[in-house]
């Protein structure tokens, strides 16, 4: 229950909000690049945030706000490509679950002064921007993560990650779909207010 899934524009930014409906979640656009997401109930999967559509390799993305997860959650630059269908994450912070623990480690890269582990994994018959599909996920996971539980801010040089992925044979699709700073929750609870620039 809560805010129904939707996409659109607000304050000059693209937003995407998706929930499987199992958890109790409220997503609110605050104007500009800001959004607030509150979720509870420790069930279901949800992801929402603001950014751009289409995404771009050359973008430098800054974010600031508060991120207070309880349980499994990510705060990341999150997006999709088509041709090939790829879901990607540049994870800045996360809750109780390290997303790199369930993926295949490919290497590491230093971007914006921080080290990120690079991973990939396949998703089978899973939700995507094109309905239920089988597709690859690309991950950069900041190690160590930025501390959750309060104020958080940072800048992500997207090109740095995309180039590192390409150097490891991880090729994104040729057509970019959305690219947002997303808060994701899985069978957890929490709150986040994030402003993207």
Swiss-Prot record:
Main localization is secreted
Q: Does the keyword Secreted apply?
A: yes
Q: Which Pfam families match?
A: Glyco_hydro_11 (PF00457)
Catalytic center residues:
87, 184
User: Which ranges carry the GH11 domain?
Assistant: 1-197
Is Plastid given among the entry's keywords? no
Top EC class, one word = hydrolase
EC number annotated for this UniProt entry: 3.2.1.8
Swiss-Prot/TrEMBL catalytic activity: Endohydrolysis of (1->4)-beta-D-xylosidic linkages in xylans
Which top-rank group of organisms is this from? Eukaryota
Disulfide pairings? 111-160
Q: Which residues cross the membrane?
A: none
GO biological process, any? xylan catabolic process
Q: Which GO terms describe its cellular component?
A: extracellular region
**Which pathway features in its UniProt record?**
Glycan degradation; xylan degradation
Query: What's this protein's function?
Result: Hydrolyzes xylans into xylobiose and xylose.
Write out the similarity annotation: Belongs to the glycosyl hydrolase 11 (cellulase G) family.
What name has this protein been given in UniProt? Endo-1,4-beta-xylanase A
* Originating species: Schizophyllum commune
Q: What is the lineage of its organism?
A: Eukaryota, Fungi, Dikarya, Basidiomycota, Agaricomycotina
**Annotated gene:** XYNA
